[in-house]
Amino acid sequence: MSIRPNNYCALLCRDPRRLRLINSHPIVVDLVRRCLEESGLKFEFYQNSNVTCAFKFSKHLFRRRGLTSEEDGIKIRNALANIVAEMSKINWEVDFSTDIGRHLTNSCIFFTQNLNPKEDASGNVFTFAPSGTSKALLINVPDGIENQIVDGIKKVIKISDPEKLDTKASRIEMSSFAWYSTGDSAISIR
């Protein structure tokens, strides 16, 4: 399949406070806006041209160690997961993504439209995300799957018991590990 302007779009985290939509199809703009509104995050929508628009947040959400609160981190991660799930329902699939939320890396989620869907997209999207130096957030993970993930991590490294947060999230803390660590053991943990 060749990529044409009418069957791709991208969400770009270019700025710590801005999510830009490239090749902004009206149905996709409405979907992204709805998912962000449902997240409870405050943002302004603006359109630069017929093919690009942006959502500017009131807080820095895409910067390492720049979140104003863990709750905001959960909200934006949950919103992005919902965007992926909702896009899938209208036959837009993640083609690839880069490291989301790293300061000044132009993180991106690139979507292509599946013009010949073979299966119905169904099910929820959940998130496993680094948080702080040595913590991880499990967002919207069904209990059975969360237990499997936690058990799998425990086989590799010592961790705290999952702490349930006010939202649909749990936090675990890893002992003697930092996300920025290098080397073979750090890679195996990731």
List each model region and its residues:
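Interaction-mediating elements
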Residues: 1-78, 96-190
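Low-complexity, intrinsically disordered activation/interaction regions
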Residues: 90-96
